[in-house]
Amino acid sequence: MAKLIPLYQYAGQDLGIMGLGKSGMATARALAGTGTRVHAWDDSPILRDAARAESVPLCDLTDQTSRTSPWPALQGVVWSPGIPHTFPQPHPVAVIAHERGVPLFCDIDLLARARQDCFFLGITGTNGKSTTTALIGHILKAARHPVQVGGNLGTPALSFEPLPFHGTYVLELSSYQLELVPSLCCDVAVLLNITPDHLARHGGMDGYIAAKRQIFRCGPRPGVAVVCIDDEPSLAIHDALCRENGRKVVAVSTRALPRGGVGAVDGQLVDATQGRPRAVADLTTIATLPGAHNWQNAAAAYAACRQHGIDAKIIVEAMASFPGLPHRQELVAEIDGVRFINDSKATNADAADKALRCYDTVYWIAGGQPKEGGIVSLEPHFHRMRQAYLIGQAAPAFERTLKGKVPLSQVGTLTRAVTEAAKAAWRDAIPGAVVLLSPACASWDQFSSFEHRGDIFRELVADLAHTRAAAKPGGRR
């Protein structure tokens, strides 16, 4: 059995756990055997049954009137970030906690309290944070630093194996998590970008920006702030941080080389943090980091790792071997001159914009559970689209935006979209053609997650490749 983060400082205390998904169960496992009195709950009977099977102590936290209610003794509630605690409507357990003055925090906060002897690198942003987090982890591993990578990306914080003294935790931090980490002080904190997303959950754009800014909240020893300044909200945060005493701020941009910062204009990575600008790498040669958005991710990762003490040569060599992440402009296959790109992680228009910029002849598969703002912002890329194939709940709204500007089909399902897009691309036989799944929508209307959506796309493309090969003279049937 893997070792878990030691949480013995909670021995003898009562802690609630609200939400028994991946992070909640990891918390329950980490607290087991520490002498902490755990009171766990989830609204889902299925998740409660799974927790019960692991002997997790269950208690209905929505009931504060029972004689056995733990509320009078609770020191805090470890909160699953996906459960609303303020907007649009706070969960009843959050209301009770607020009325009783019981603090809410997430699993990452427990990690931060338990491992004050380690370094923390935190990454947030509307888009690009998973790639940047994985890239930083890849670089630190190449530099032979003891490191664990996770948070919002993959591994829950309390599923990490304990690192040695001065090891480094590299954490992807969502806006939901950043509202619940009062103890986290990042030694290097990275903000990539801010565009409208999750607005209902944060009560509007101001609340969303405020949540993102929490990554720079710290105690008397502020860490280094790495801020990409290519959007107005991020630039405003950068300027405010520069006015703080004792705070080192490194600006990053793909539009121009910031004074004393790091630039990636046209994919040319340049470091001016030591004064005189120095060319570092040509990012356009790294196939797993295509496009200006990935150059921003790479520049931010470079800046963060340099501030963490990693040599520039090691960083650049590690970037060249970065394998990339699935569902982020992932080349699934090239079949008879047509590339099939899985960008299922593009769950909003800004993310889809980043992918569309990279290709000139696009058969675009889009739609799903719509996000606020739709796809009006993508009009500068409509000329790249040979045809749009619309799926899911957003299809009618997307059709209204595209009609008369882009040839389109409301196909309903991903299966039909892939089939029809492939047929059209092969028929047209235009060099450089791409069938691009970049939905600009969440996936939950038809899939369990963006990963599920991307996996189905992969399977459909594999079926196409098999069928196409079998149909050729001499092909296997």
Swiss-Prot record:
Its main location: cytoplasm. Its EC number is 6.3.2.9. Belongs to the MurCDEF family. PANTHER family: UDP-N-ACETYLMURAMOYLALANINE--D-GLUTAMATE LIGASE. One of its GO terms (biological process) is cell division. GO terms for molecular function: ATP binding; UDP-N-acetylmuramoylalanine-D-glutamate ligase activity. It catalyses: UDP-N-acetyl-alpha-D-muramoyl-L-alanine + D-glutamate + ATP = UDP-N-acetyl-alpha-D-muramoyl-L-alanyl-D-glutamate + ADP + phosphate + H(+). This is UDP-N-acetylmuramoylalanine--D-glutamate ligase. Pathway: Cell wall biogenesis; peptidoglycan biosynthesis. It comes from Rhodospirillum rubrum (strain ATCC 11170 / ATH 1.1.1 / DSM 467 / LMG 4362 / NCIMB 8255 / S1). ATP binds at residues 125-131.
